[in-house]
UniProtKB/Swiss-Prot annotation:
InterPro entries: Ntn_hydrolases_N, Proteasome_beta2, Proteasome_bsu_CS, Proteasome_sua/b, Proteasome_suB-type
Pfam family, one: Proteasome
Major localisation: cytoplasm
UniProt superkingdom: Eukaryota
Function summary: Non-catalytic component of the proteasome, a multicatalytic proteinase complex which is characterized by its ability to cleave peptides with Arg, Phe, Tyr, Leu, and Glu adjacent to the leaving group at neutral or slightly basic pH. The proteasome has an ATP-dependent proteolytic activity.
Recorded family membership: Belongs to the peptidase T1B family.
This protein's GO CC annotations: cytosol; nucleus; proteasome core complex, beta-subunit complex
Keyword set includes Disulfide bond: no
Any one GO BP annotation for this protein: proteasome-mediated ubiquitin-dependent protein catabolic process
Subunit structure: The 26S proteasome consists of a 20S proteasome core and two 19S regulatory subunits. The 20S proteasome core is composed of 28 subunits that are arranged in four stacked rings, resulting in a barrel-shaped structure. The two end rings are each formed by seven alpha subunits, and the two central rings are each formed by seven beta subunits. The catalytic chamber with the active sites is on the inside of the barrel.
Protein name as catalogued: Probable proteasome subunit beta type-2
Protein's cellular compartments: Cytoplasm; Nucleus
Organism: Drosophila melanogaster
Keyword annotations: Cytoplasm, Nucleus, Proteasome
């Protein structure tokens, strides 16, 4: 399991992704500003964990192919279609000598299908899901997400839920994941939100509206 963390939450009209920004090699800390959430199109984004070279190369390959599809057909693939293409590509590479060690969460918004969040593991298995995570930190967040997620979740509550998860990770995980970047995609497109870090984690302010 990767010494990284990515989390995803789907709401009624949006999807939110969060990831730590730490880059490490074995037990060596390299830097703390590595972005792991990548823009695939105006309404699709992907968070990845795994081998550093594999995540960059594979994400770039998927992004370029989705852009080529847009040029060829005049429209972007929906999150569901993009997830299917990504899953198939990853599964095909498993059957060759060029296997990518990468797992991901793919999030998107479509005017017809609405918001969509897909969990894709390193073996090419994919599942549409309401909340998910990859990496060590996600082990501490599953019960939190199951308890507090609901189908009417607002963006503000989803962000508070992300902060609750990050706080639990920083309490219990020996690995120092001190900074998390957060992105949301909805009918207005993909945009970056305020990062979650020790400076923004005021324990008293983390409250949910239900």
């Amino acid at each position: 399991m990767a010494m990284e963390t990515i989390l995803g939450i789907k709401g009624p009209d949006f999807v939110m992704l969060a990831s730590d920004t730490m880059q490490a090699k074995s037990l060596v800390f390299m830097k703390d500003d590595q972005s792991k959430i990548h823009r695939l199109s105006d309404f699709n984004m992907m968070a990845t964990v795994g081998d550093g070279g594999d995540t960059i190369q594979f994400t770039d390959f998927i992004s370029k192919n989705l852009h080529l599809y847009k040029i060829s057909h005049g429209y972007h693939l929906s999150a569901k279609s993009a997830a299917h293409f990504t899953r198939k590509t990853l599964a095909d590479y498993i059957r060759t000598n060029t296997r990518y060690q990468v797992a991901m969460l793919l999030a998107g918004y479509d005017a017809v299908e609405g918001p969509d969040l897909h969990y894709i593991d390193s073996y090419g298995a994919a599942q549409s899901i309401n909340h998910a995570g990859h990496g060590w930190g996600s082990m501490f967040c599953g019960s939190i997400l199951q308890r507090y997620w609901n189908s009417k979740l607002s963006q503000e509550d989803a962000y508070s839920l992300m902060k609750k998860c990050v706080l639990e990770i920083q309490r219990r995980l020996i690995i120092n994941q001190r900074n998390f970047e957060v992105y949301v995609v909805d009918s207005k497109g993909m945009r970056k939100m305020e990062a979650i870090n020790p400076g923004s984690l005021n324990k008293e302010s983390i409250s949910l509206s239900w």
